[in-house]
């Protein structure tokens, strides 16, 4: 999780936003909630797939056949685990953005207007058609597009209309 850099004076001391943070008020977003069925914790601002155990579950994307159902939302009141990590552990309720805007950190450089892709080998981290076409290892997130041109590892904006 990104932390504000307070080593300089003046200017913008905080990041644009944090991965998975909504850019607008909650009432302007359409979200669903599903239970993380996998032992792998789910991060904020990544694509997740429909679970296999029931209609009310989701999981980390591990294969191209795991079709994305939305992007994980960061809740500001999430407690850290014993290791200091803040994410959605197994059996946690995971808020999933279906319609709205959020901040996200791309795994690769992305261009404004490019389709959001889930990078399979990175467990659902986000890329775009700027880095390569959808195909093996690069699954399109339905209705999701980058609103900003963003360098890999920096904060950008995503719009999703599911």
Model regions and ranges:
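Surface-exposed, low-hydrophobicity beta-strand/loop segments enriched in small/polar/acidic residues
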Residues: 1-162
């Amino acid at each position: 999780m990104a932390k504000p850099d307070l080593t300089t004076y003046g200017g913008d001391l905080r990041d644009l936003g944090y991965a998975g943070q909504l850019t607008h008020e909650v009432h302007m977003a359409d979200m669903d909630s599903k239970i993380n069925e996998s032992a792998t914790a789910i991060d904020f601002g990544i694509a997740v797939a429909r679970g296999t155990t029931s209609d009310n579950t989701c999981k980390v994307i591990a294969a191209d056949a795991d079709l994305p159902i939305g992007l994980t939302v960061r809740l500001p009141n999430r407690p850290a685990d014993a290791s200091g990590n803040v994410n959605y552990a197994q059996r946690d309720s995971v808020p999933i953005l279906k319609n709205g805007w959020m901040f996200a950190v791309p795994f690769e450089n992305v261009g404004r207007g490019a389709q959001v892709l889930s990078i399979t080998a990175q467990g659902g981290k986000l890329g775009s058609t700027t880095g390569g076409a959808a195909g093996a290892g690069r699954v399109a997130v339905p209705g999701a597009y980058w609103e900003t041109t963003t360098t890999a590892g920096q904060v950008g904006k995503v719009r999703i209309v599911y």
